[in-house]
UniProtKB/Swiss-Prot annotation:
Chain positions recorded as homogentisate binding sites: 333, 354
Origin superkingdom: Bacteria
Pathway: Amino-acid degradation; L-phenylalanine degradation; acetoacetate and fumarate from L-phenylalanine: step 4/6
Protein family according to the UniProt entry: Belongs to the homogentisate dioxygenase family.
Keyword presence, Cell membrane: no
Binding residues for Fe cation: 318, 324, 354
Protein's UniProt name: Homogentisate 1,2-dioxygenase
GO molecular function, one term: iron ion binding
Taxonomic path: Bacteria, Pseudomonadati, Pseudomonadota, Gammaproteobacteria, Legionellales
Residue pairs linked by disulfide bridges in the UniProt entry: none
Quaternary structure (record): Hexamer; dimer of trimers.
Pfam families: HgmA_C (PF04209), HgmA_N (PF20510)
Catalytic activity entry: homogentisate + O2 = 4-maleylacetoacetate + H(+)
Length: 416
């Protein structure tokens, strides 16, 4: 059961009467609870941008105890050089992932000043262990397995073909439902993700607000030791407290975790000729200070009909102002016949040439242009800042050092 509607002002209570009816912070909260506000923006942001929620908890967060440096870190140093070369990886695995929970199975791929990308792998649930990211919100893009995200606001269920966003500072734990779970994770430290402007598309299309789902209140009232791991200023810290941090009995507000089924995306594409720019596939965006230039765009290439006439239908050859990191959830990406599989990653930074590989080009340039259904789901994290690759990703055996060879079959066919 979920609450519906992107950015709506929701309210939910797990126990009847837990929400105060007429105010935020009464002298004595109902049921002996404590009122606590969680702000996602500055108090004075314009009303339509202002994010906050009021939580009614068994104990306030100040009782969590003292944080100490954690021996493990998820962020890794970047390579010194900014290579102009295109890069690609097969799915990445480490020996540390033989038995691991969500935090232990994170692999830092690349980052920019306000965005970082990881892959996650987990085959072990977090029982009395919790995670929070003070540095930014987290966007989950699973490609295998099923997980449940237990948050301060309630539970989200997540599997391949859906996404979830955990706001900055919200504590959660990951329960692995399948044998193992794999996915991509994007950390956004810029403006919170929101729906893109539709412009001439009109009032409807792309990701519809009513399809975004928010959790109903649910809480843990358990004693014993509970470990909280917190990412703060690029480092991990931990504390051990005598109660669960997921002790919110009721809440109201517009700053909360949410999930979305990508199959509900209303895809816009050409019904005449040419290949529209990939911005028409934007699901969520983090706006920068420059209008029309995003800090982060989350873009998908979903299942769709391809019907363009007298047109090269796959993505065109391109040198881009923006910086692209791509992944694949399922299927076969229409611009890459080989080498790019679910769990894989490619990075094409500013002005790095990219486009269909030779085999894909040959097929698309000569095929009979009948309506064709593409049954795959690829995605892109696009940023205004350069993707800097981590040392561990650059030196990982999964990096395809021969990636550029996929374009070496092209011949000169020019004739006057």
């Amino acid at each position: 059961m979920y609450l519906q509607g992107f950015g709506n002002y929701h309210h939910s209570e797990a126990v009847k009467g837990a929400l105060p009816p007429n105010q935020n912070s009464p002298q004595h909260c109902n049921l002996g609870l404590y009122a606590e506000q969680l702000s996602g923006t500055a108090f004075t942001r314009p009303r339509h941008n202002n994010l906050r929620s009021w939580l009614y908890r068994i104990l306030p967060t100040v009782t969590q105890g003292t944080y100490y440096p954690y021996e493990f870190n998820i962020m890794h140093s970047f390579v010194d050089e900014f290579s102009p070369n295109a890069m690609r990886w097969s799915p990445l695995y480490n020996s540390s992932q033989i038995k691991c929970d969500f935090v232990e199975g994170l692999f830092h791929i690349a980052g920019s000043p306000l965005v970082n990308t990881y892959t996650y792998y987990c085959n072990h649930s977090m029982s009395d262990k919790y995670f929070a990211n003070n540095d930014g919100e987290l966007l989950f893009v699973p490609y295998a397995g099923e997980i449940h995200l237990y948050t301060e606001f309630g539970k989200l269920m997540l599997s391949s073909g859906s996404i979830a966003v955990i706001p900055r500072g919200v504590k959660f734990k990951v329960e692995v439902i399948s044998k193992e779970a794999k996915g991509y994770l994007c950390e956004n430290s810029g403006n919170p993700l929101t729906l893109p402007q539709l412009g001439p598309i009109g009032a409807n299309g792309l990701a519809n607000p009513r399809h975004f789902q928010y959790p109903v209140a649910a809480f843990e009232d358990s004693g014993g030791e509970h470990t909280i791991i917190c990412k703060n200023q690029k480092k991990l810290w931990f504390t051990v407290c005598n109660h669960s941090p997921l002790n919110v009995v009721a809440w109201h507000g517009n700053y909360a975790p949410y999930c979305y089924d990508l199959s509900l995306f209303n895809t816009i594409n050409t019904v005449s000729f040419d290949h529209p720019d990939p911005s028409i596939f934007t699901v969520l965006t983090s706006e920068s200070e420059i209008p029309g230039v995003s800090n982060l765009d989350f873009v998908i290439f979903p299942p769709r009909w391809m019907v363009a006439e007298h047109t090269f239908r796959p993505p065109y050859f391109h040198r881009n102002y923006m910086n692209e990191l791509m992944g694949l959830v399922y299927g076969e990406y229409d611009a890459k016949k080989e080498g790019f599989i679910p769990g894989g990653i490619s990075i094409h930074n500013c002005m790095t040439p990219h486009g269909p590989d030779y085999e894909s080009y040959e097929i698309a340039a000569s095929q009979d242009l009948k309506p064709n259904y593409i049954n795959s789901l690829a995605f892109m994290f696009e940023t205004k800042d350069y993707w800097q690759v981590t040392e561990q990703a650059y030196r990982h055996p999964s990096r395809q050092v021969d990636y550029l060879n996929c374009w070496q079959g092209f011949k000169v066919e020019f004739s006057q």
